[in-house]
Regions:
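Generic structural marker for isolated residues within well-ordered, non-membrane alpha-helices
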Residues: 37, 48, 83
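The alpha-helix within a helix-turn-helix
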Residues: 41, 52, 87
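Helix-turn-helix/homeodomain-like alpha-helical modules used for DNA recognition
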Residues: 102-103
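DNA major-groove recognition helix of helix-turn-helix/homeodomain DNA-binding modules
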Residues: 76-96
Length: 103
């Protein structure tokens, strides 16, 4: 049976395609955030582990943020509270981490 692309039975395929398209749009933003975090961390003389601990997140999660990838093929999408905790630990404004980014 062939299900037309707009049919409700084919909604999963449509969502997957849309999600992939959104991921592609978010890659540059996730990578830019990762670079900004890395630069700010290095400027403060902190290790990834020390910054993660100060922000209350795992080192593994922080490493994923710097890389910009949550799992293979998926851009990182941190919570606002995580961004605030990292900005606080780095003694920078959240805007310095995310300001000026666009798709």
């Amino acid at each position: 049976m062939v299900v037309p692309s707009g049919h409700p039975l084919n909604a999963g395929a449509v969502r997957a395609s849309s999600s992939t398209s959104q991921d592609e749009q978010w890659w540059p933003i996730a990578r830019q955030l990762g670079l900004r975090l890395q630069r700010a961390r290095i400027d403060k003389g902190l290790s990834q582990e020390a910054l993660a601990h100060a922000a209350g997140i795992s080192t593994y999660t922080y490493q994923k943020l710097e890389k910009g990838e949550s799992r293979p093929g998926t851009p990182m999408n941190p919570r606002l509270r995580t961004l605030i905790a990292l900005a606080t630990a780095l003694d920078v404004r959240v805007e310095e981490l995310v300001g000026g980014m666009s798709e």
